[in-house]
């Protein structure tokens, strides 16, 4: 069992997001952990416990906080965030919130993808976490046959040629379902 990652291309295909800026092709930028982060405390200057491997979600609270800062303080706060080089910074509610111009400038400067979504922060976070949990879930591939018998999954394992597939065929004839044969992930 190895570690898995998911590309930003997969995420933008499956979750409602569009690209504002990307330093390279979306399929070359990978996310390795299933957690996301709202960087409100980080933007306010509290830098402890910040995980730069997480996607950074900018919602209404973060954007309103930044709009209340002077241009110099806003640039400084955003520079601190983009300097961490997270996989991407995503601005939610893009119909009412537009990324600050300095966000695109800093994304280019630090090589960080900048995305936006029309979804609310909670909806986007739920969708992202769901896709990330599915794509990054630990898994192994086993040689065998997977069948569903009376609603329960049963994995039939054994040496090659002992009749695993024949057993599965008999179960299917009796109304049960074949899920996978040969290589089961």
Description of each model-found segment:
Residues 80, 106, 170-171:
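Hydrophobic/aromatic ligand-binding patch that stacks against planar heteroaromatic rings
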Residues 85-90, 94-131:
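Charged, amphipathic alpha-helical linker segments immediately N-terminal to NTP-binding catalytic cores
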Residues 59-61, 93-94, 118, 150-152, ...:
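Fold-independent oxyanion-binding glycine-rich loops
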Residues 151-179:
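Glycine-rich phosphate-binding P-loop
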Residues 137, 174-185:
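Short beta-strand-centered segment that lines the nucleotide-binding/catalytic pocket of NTP-utilizing
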Residues 1-82:
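Gly/Thr-rich phosphate-binding loop signature of adenosyl cofactor/nucleotide-binding cores
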Residues 131-151:
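P-loop NTPase nucleotide-binding/switch module
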Residues 54-57, 87-90, 112-113, 153-155, ...:
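Structural motif
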